Amino acid sequence: MAYPLPLVLCFALVVAQVWGSTTPPTGTSEPPDVQTVEPTEDDILQNEADNQENVLSQLLGDYDKVKAVSEGSDCQCKCVVRPLGRDACQRINQGASRKEDFYTVETITSGSSCKCACVAPPSAVNPCEGDFRLQKLREADSRDLKLSTIIDLLEGAFYGLDLLKLHSVTTKLVGRVDKLEEEVSKNLTKENEQIKEDVEEIRTELNKRGKENCSDNTLESMPDIRSALQRDAAAAYAHPEYEERFLQEETVSQQINSIELLRTQPLVPPAAMKPQRPLQRQVHLRGRLASKPTVIRGITYYKAKVSEEENDIEEQHDELFSGDSGVDLLIEDQLLRQEDLLTSATRRPATTRHTAAVTTDASIQAAASSSEPAQASASASSFVEPAPQASDRELLATPQTTTVFPEPTEVMPSTQVSPTTVAHTAVQPLPAMVPGDIFVEALPLVPLLPDTVGTDMPEEEGTAGQEATSAGPILSPEEEDDIRNVIGRCKDTLSTITGPTTQNTYGRNEGAWMKDPLAKDDRIYVTNYYYGNTLVEFRNLENFKQGRWSNSYKLPYSWIGTGHVVYNGAFYYNRAFTRNIIKYDLKQRYVAAWAMLHDVAYEEATPWRWQGHSDVDFAVDENGLWLIYPALDDEGFNQEVIVLSKLNAVDLSTQKETTWRTGLRRNFYGNCFVICGVLYAVDSYNQRNANISYAFDTHTNTQIVPRLLFENEYSYTTQIDYNPKDRLLYAWDNGHQVTYHVIFAY
């Protein structure tokens, strides 16, 4: 035992000497000639790489801070924490604590109706908490701790973390990464430009050298190359299969000569053939190709094409007017033009079909005869842009204009058409060029609106054009984003709700399933049970029936109830046990908006059983997003009433002008939904034969008792939501997903 002691002492002396030689004395300073130099980009990047842990600690340092939670409008809270010292916490962990080893958390409030609470994580009041829990986890195997103890330790480690703050920290980190990517991309672009310049210089240098050194040699070797190519071609085309392949690429005259030669060549074996004959023929053909290869092929090709067009003009004429060709492209073009003009969707593709016929016929007549140039040019211009008035008069003044239309006699007495109605200007000149029976057969498909026809007075044509353009809804850019332009308009009064149609059986007794009315696809979103934090997505109804989910979203905050909706790519729900409503962006996967309902009558102690409806219920109809929740009636005797409010889908704000206090009372109805601005409520959720016993119209501020039959097929309906895109009610009935068709009175 005495031998290792001198070694230890020697090692200590060596370490002390090395440390003393490497560390400068404390009283010395840097020499005056050493100046501070600005760091370069490499130094900055190296410092960033070395200080990664420091950056993370700076960003995550406020996790251990104490948080104050306040409730009330004029409430101000402040938390004062006196934590333990590190020596004190070590004494507590060792079991030798003193009287002065304690921490305090004080709450300072200001305001009349103020409630404050201080949330202090263990790491904020006890600096040794993290080391203590880490030591316990390391000793878990030796002490044989139970799983519950480990879970408690992990919960304590995550206690006090705020996911919104975590999102902000992640955003900061992403910002730093974006800056790094920008710098790297700039450097890469500079390097790529430099490399391109170097490559161009090398290419130009090589081209110069190649031209100087190899031009004479190339010219001298050209005859040798040509002779070698001719010999190779003669040897290759000596076989019959190669000769056929060569003849297919020759012109018509060469094919005729080759066919005559081929009739005699198969009778001779390949070994008996003389090499001089195909060699002479090959040289002769190569000479013809070198002289005019392109001219021969081009002339032959264009002559054949033009002759076919001249012979088939009548067939194309019939095909175009029969609607069998050239229609799809014009229909697509006409639909795009209708969207640009913002007209209503009352025109049919038949209008475009006749437009295509007129345009084609006008071009054919212009090519066939030059006696009517004004008519052809006017008809063609009426398809591309609004035609002049004089051209329209010339087109419509033909004798057949008033005799071909036997049915719509109230439309055709006018001989002048507004220049702004492009499609109708192209339709009406049609009888002057097409036989009457063809147009009369297709006439019922053409919708002719009375608003689009002008009068007999020339000075009123401008007014008629204005009326024609105003026949459809002229929408402003702000109104184009309205939901009614995507999913349609209201169908007026609700008349009947059909019986339920069971689509699937999935999940627990309570839950909700929904579709996004503004989405182009048919994705289905499911929340299983009335409490949780996982939203499941299915690609379509068939995948939902098969149980094949395509995506899942782990929400940062749990939801409660079944009154959620998916609207315009976001999930709207009520945060569990709070007055908060949340908008969660499904594409970006983050909380896009957050709001608090200050007047909601929220039950602090919510029982863990289904109440028959959700306290906070979202709804979607043709007008947008709605919110239904209980509140205290300030105008009455502080009784609870059900409030219906139009919700801003962007920031979750409400307006007093679009908020109504209904006659519903909590726990006196089953489920509710909104259709065309009217709130409907079902009287029971657990009776098979229920009724829609209440309706509140936001347009007239009136309430009625409609007494419409509503069937709860499985006698336990926990969700009813209206989808304005499908005109269906989506319901969750005792683990069954059912739909109801909505029938309107008008």
Swiss-Prot record:
Annotated coiled-coil positions are 43-68, 179-213
> Which key words are in the record?
Coiled coil, Disulfide bond, Glycoprotein, Secreted, Signal
Which region is the signal sequence?
1-20
Instruction: Spell out the Low complexity composition-biased ranges.
Output: 346-382
Q: Where is this region: Disordered?
A: 346-393, 454-479
Q: Name one GO biological process term.
A: extracellular matrix organization
Chief place where the protein resides: secreted
Q: Which GO terms describe its molecular function?
A: extracellular matrix binding; identical protein binding
Looking at the keywords, is Coiled coil present? yes
The GO cellular component terms are:
extracellular matrix; extracellular region
What are the Olfactomedin-like domain coordinates in residue numbering? Answer: 489-746
Where does the record say this protein resides? Secreted
Tell me what PTMs the record reports for this protein: O-glycosylated and N-glycosylated.
Pfam families in UniProt: OLF
Summary of the tissues where the protein is detected: Broadly expressed. Within the eye, present in ganglion cells, inner nuclear layers, inner segment of photoreceptor layers and retinal pigment epithelium (at protein level).
Annotated S-S bridges: C490-C676
Q: Which SMART domains match?
A: OLF (SM00284)
Q: Where are the transmembrane segments?
A: none
Sugar-bearing residue positions: N187, N213, N691
Oligomeric state and partners?
Homodimer. Binds to heparin and chondroitin sulfate E.
* Protein name per Swiss-Prot or TrEMBL: Olfactomedin-like protein 2B
What's the source species for this entry?
Mus musculus (Mouse)
